[in-house]
Amino acid sequence: MKAGIHPEYKAVNATCSCGNSFVFNSTLGKDTMHLDVCDKCHPFYSGKQRIVDTGGRVERFNKRFGALSAKK
């Protein structure tokens, strides 16, 4: 490998919203990373059925166009 052309590869501490924390190596410029879901709290990996919704497109659509459908 050539010296001086590759990004710095360092340990990054990732913290999930559920409280789970782990360390991995990355070229990310920060020392910490905050996650919304991880393997401990994601429904696919945990086996628990819960809705993972960050309040997105459906609510925004209903807010913009919900009144129009009620008038018909």
Swiss-Prot record:
Binds 1 zinc ion per subunit. One of its GO terms (biological process) is translation. InterPro entries: Ribosomal_bL28/bL31-like_sf (IPR034704), Ribosomal_bL31 (IPR002150), Ribosomal_bL31_A (IPR027491), Ribosomal_bL31_sf (IPR042105). GO terms for molecular function: metal ion binding; rRNA binding; structural constituent of ribosome. Its cofactor is Zn(2+). Keywords: Metal-binding, Ribonucleoprotein, Ribosomal protein, RNA-binding, rRNA-binding, Zinc. Binds the 23S rRNA. This is Large ribosomal subunit protein bL31. Part of the 50S ribosomal subunit. Belongs to the bacterial ribosomal protein bL31 family. Type A subfamily. The keyword Metal-binding applies. It holds the Pfam family Ribosomal_L31. It comes from the Bacteria. Zn(2+) binds at C16, C18, C38, C41. NCBIfam families: L31, PRK00019.1, PRK00528.1. GO terms for cellular component: ribonucleoprotein complex; ribosome.
